[in-house]
Amino acid sequence: MEQPPEDQGPQREPYNEWTLELLEELKHEAVRHFPREWLHGLGQHIYNTYGDTWEGVEAIIRILQQLLFIHFRIGCHHSRIGIIRQRRIRNGSGRS
């Protein structure tokens, strides 16, 4: 039978450390784009729903990722990423 190699490459960070670092990065970025009061309310909702659990940490990460993605996709004023809305100028050139 085939056996997996003994050396699986470099040791990875433990999942919980990586998850907490990701959460801190997302929180730091979210504070730059959303009101603190709104983010605090979101955090309270997650805490009331999940308590102090890893499931709550994963939920807030998922929500912050989705919010930031949509925010950038719509067009953040702090970023070049996103849809650039162009105004149409009516000059009559497109009419026949």
Curated annotation (Swiss-Prot):
GO cellular component term, pick one: host cell
Chief subcellular location: virion
Record's function text: During virus replication, may deplete host UNG protein, and incude G2-M cell cycle arrest. Acts by targeting specific host proteins for degradation by the 26S proteasome, through association with the cellular CUL4A-DDB1 E3 ligase complex by direct interaction with host VPRPB/DCAF-1. Cell cycle arrest reportedly occurs within hours of infection and is not blocked by antiviral agents, suggesting that it is initiated by the VPR carried into the virion. Additionally, VPR induces apoptosis in a cell cycle dependent manner suggesting that these two effects are mechanistically linked.
Keywords for the protein's UniProt record, in alphabetical order: Activator, AIDS, Apoptosis, Cell cycle, Host G2/M cell cycle arrest by virus, Host nucleus, Host-virus interaction, Ion channel, Ion transport, Modulation of host cell cycle by virus, Phosphoprotein, Transcription, Transcription regulation, Transport, Viral penetration into host nucleus, Virion, Virus entry into host cell
Protein name: Protein Vpr
Coiled-coil blocks: none
Post-translational modification summary for this protein: Phosphorylated on several residues by host. These phosphorylations regulate VPR activity for the nuclear import of the HIV-1 pre-integration complex.
Modification Phosphoserine, positions: 79, 96
Family: Belongs to the HIV-1 VPR protein family.
